Amino acid sequence: MAFDPLSLAYHEAGHAIVARHFGCELIDIFISLDDQCGGATVTVCGLNEWQKGLIALAGCAAEVLAGHAVADDPDRAWEYLKDANDAQQAVGEITGLDIGDDGFRNAYDALEAEAEELIRRPPIWSAIVALAAVLAERHAVDGATAMSIIDPILSGFADHSQGASAPQPELSGTA
């Protein structure tokens, strides 16, 4: 099964740009068109659970915003499930709630809405578009190349400098 390179590229670019926004060093980003991997973004940094959840949800959010989402494609369902599981783990760590507890879904939805809002910020979205274009063409980008593409775009973004020490918002699990 071959996947759409632009869809995969937006997905991985979403993860990479949000990770970079939080101060992560990008090591490698790649997409794979014909295996079950789909792609991966490899980073080095210390993150809090909130940031990990935002990064996990940013991939699908970027794909949807770009109009390339294939979330209902059973061949890619595992990829979305892994990201959702990572975000659920983050919500559990933040709130102390288990997936079936009252309020868990509200907290998850709040994290998801924040990821969607974050990638809509013009510098972040511009960086996602720029990196996705390169990824769709090359299928792999090393971290230094990726950062040389996106850092000039993000440098004008006021809160990009907050890095990995960004405060964690309160996700109480209630709406």
Regions found by a protein language model. Give the residues of each.
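Soluble catalytic regions of large protease machineries
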Residues: 2-175
